[in-house]
Amino acid sequence: MTLFRHLVRITSPRLPFICGSSRRFSAKTAAVERVVSSFRSVTGDEGVSVGSAVREQHGRDESVHRCRPPDVVVFPRSVEEVSALAKICHHYRLPIIPFGTGTGLEGGVGALQGGVCFSLRKMEQVVDLHQEDFDVTVEPGVTRKSLNSYLRDTGLWFPVDPGADASLCGMAATSASGTNAVRYGTMRENVLNLEVVLADGTILHTAGKGRRPRKTAAGYNLTNLFVGSEGTLGIITKATLRLYGVPESMVSAVCSFPSVQSAVDSTVQILQAGVPIARIEFLDDVMINACNRFNNLSYAVTPTLFLEFHGSSKSMEEQVSVTEEITRDNGGSDFAWAEDEETRSRLWKARHDAWYAAMALRPGCKAYSTDVCVPISRLPQIIVETKADLISNNITGPIAGHVGDGNFHCLIVLDPNDTDEVQRVHSFTERLARRALAMDGTCTGEHGIGLGKRALLREEVGPLAIEVMKGLKASLDPRNLMNPGKVLELTQTNTEQ
């Protein structure tokens, strides 16, 4: 079932431990208390909560999906506690839902079958920093902003920035990216090793315990197996990440265009010219107007590119010269520069606040972000067609995107109580995803599959690939306890084994 059908149809009974075979003991108060007591023996009383407010908080993310909350929330402080808690869940066949900061956009933390939420916020240590090797190992409670604050005096930084201050292990779990991906890659290119607790409590080091080579040809790439697995294969309890030197110089610019076509054509030509641009973000006229209103800015209300250049002063001069020539040839305006750190931060804050700026267009409504990605040569066509589709169907959906790697979002704002609008938006999102697939792209560039795109995943990769994924899942999690119902459709495995 796709996103908007969930939005209007999902209702779930809220009974304790409705999770497969656990139904047999859910009605037995003594058995429930025994399970909770087992959890408390691992974490202490403060590490377990069955309070409704805490459960509700941990049963939702930033998406429009609203299922049911978990039955219990646990707060482990170490990988040993995560392992011990997982073993208890495995014994009682209780679903496990990992929770980082709750900033996901595809319903990845919803407890479809109840069960136990593992909130990892108390595991917040930077474990190892190797400045000379440009790598760091972090626990799952460390966010991207807190890591970069920690690194501030080292001359290093971690560039992957999905916008929200997400947990780094959560970013690995969803293969997140962001505005810097065109230059520095996504999480998939920046994770060197993972420590993962499997469904039965086993602790796995995907590249070998303590290993952190910049490259390896040793066996199957287990690290990349877990990057993007969305908590369905295990709980990521440590991530070893690549770091980068802070560039000698950074400068940002804004350029306005007469049309969507000219702005996106410029993007493609800049990349084809080999300019190592650090960021190149597209905002359509609706989005730039929303950003102006929300952030008290005054950019021209036309299709716009936000750009950023990194490097030495000499190399940036060359990058800027080539880029300005291309944008000028496509009818772009003179660049409005943001050179000092404060001005650059204000510009990129406006871009990262796009979600909230879009929501402010219709106060009281809900927002949903699409997330398709296509080969960059197809980008002009798909954005122009998508813009026309939004207008013809009277949908509020400002467009913003990391167009340097072919990824863009429609930040759709809708009234969930208006069934006609919900249906129009649902139909639009299906058309958009299939338009991307028809152009050799993907239904999700960075948000993940979660709940809403499981059917589209099958269309994208085909039934054989889905069966291979199911086989991998069954091998690592034969009872289907790890975040069941996400990425792959729910099965009855955990009621049968």
Curated annotation (Swiss-Prot):
Requisite cofactors: FAD
Lineage, broadest ranks: Eukaryota, Metazoa, Chordata, Craniata, Vertebrata
Ranges where the FAD-binding PCMH-type domain occurs: 65-246
Residue pairs linked by disulfide bridges in the UniProt entry: none
Keyword Transit peptide: yes
Catalytic activity: (R)-lactate + 2 Fe(III)-[cytochrome c] = 2 Fe(II)-[cytochrome c] + pyruvate + 2 H(+)
Gene Ontology terms: cellular component: mitochondrion
Domain of life: Eukaryota
Keywords: FAD, Flavoprotein, Mitochondrion, Oxidoreductase, Transit peptide
Compartments, record wording: Mitochondrion
Keyword Transmembrane: no
Functional note: Involved in D-lactate, but not L-lactate catabolic process.
EC top class, as a word: oxidoreductase
Phenotype upon loss of function: At 3 dpf, mutant embryos show no visible abnormalities compared to wild-type embryos. They do not display any ocular abnormalities at 5 dpf. They nevertheless exhibit elevated levels of D-lactate, but not L-lactate compared to wild-type larvae.
GO biological process, one term: lactate catabolic process
Protein family per UniProt: Belongs to the FAD-binding oxidoreductase/transferase type 4 family.
EC numbers: 1.1.2.4
Source organism of this protein record: Danio rerio
Broad class of the protein's primary localization: mitochondrion
Protein name as it appears in the record: Probable D-lactate dehydrogenase, mitochondrial
GO molecular function, one term: D-lactate dehydrogenase (cytochrome) activity
